[in-house]
Amino acid sequence: MAASLAKRTWVEINPKALFNNLDLCKKIAPDAEIMAVVKADAYGHGLIETVKTLDAKIDAFGVATLKEAMTILPIMERCKMVMILGALLPDERETAIKNNINVTVSSLQEAQEYNDLGRTNNKEVKVHLIVDTGMGRLGFTEKKFLRDCEEIRSFKNIDIVGMATHFPCSDHNDEFTDHQIERFKSLLKSSNIDPKWIHLANSAASLRIGSSGGTMIRPGLMIYGISPTELNDPRLQPALEWKARINQIRILEEGSSISYGRTFVTKKETKVATIAVGYGDGYPRSLSGQGAEVIVNGKRCEILGRVTMDMIMVDVSSIDEPIETGDEVILIGKDGEESISSTELAKKAGTIPWEILTGISPRVIRVIKNNR
């Protein structure tokens, strides 16, 4: 534990939980390959640490940017496919092509530009055609897809290795999602292409309806043990714990104000612990005054006043056991019978768990737990 005590705030990643969640992916879509989505620093879990952990067990990695792809290429050993899920800017494309990175194509013009770059670099560009069936973000419109696809098939430096779409509401709307799946299947059948990877299902769709008829699924949040649906799935195991340390303990008199704006004033003598974490670390300022809590010695303790950039103040009056400067505090995770999830924090902050996790800043150290 000595190494952890040298840190002010840190995240611990549990490989066993990642593997458990990966096994669940394989059970719910047994015939599909798995693309682990590791964009946004692996949803706050640490990009390099997560890729090293999962590399031997998955078929592909999905990222959002060229920088993310270039970061993980040198550490990918068994897994050979990385795909940039977003649209690349024109000045990024040549680097992607030279490094054999799979890219998305959402228009005929984009395909033409990739084909030209492929010819210039004597490369066959591996592309995934994206069809917009209801997300309204990227992709061919359904009306243009078949006509444009026919022309793209003639491009000599384009290898259509994938076809995909994205579900905007697979966490709660089965009817619309089913409609998307049927439209996608119809377009694929009429396109006269036979891509290796057909992928539709994100985490929510994978949990609710499996592979959705694809040959690959794209789990993101569920890989990290968080349910993307309103109902918590007990099969998922959260892979992340966020901890910080106490850096001061004081007794404040009745009538003492705490933090900026004096939004909280003690109504009685209060034992207050100052914790070494703040919005500069990604702990949301929007949790101020919302009844957010941390866990100290297995007990929930409420945050007092506003979250500041580097510190929060917590009421520890209910803690009977001795506490000292340097003691660990749980921000997200479990201690004894108490636990705080990213979903709980998200609700109190008025946001979603995706934002809580991806908001954990780079100055928070990521540590892989050795729990073999």
What are these regions, as identified by a protein language model?
Residues 5, 10-13, 17-20, 27, ...:
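Active-site-proximal beta-alpha core segment in soluble small-molecule metabolic enzymes
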Residues 2-15, 19, 68-70, 88-90, ...:
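Active-site anion/phosphate-binding pocket segments in diverse small-molecule metabolic enzymes
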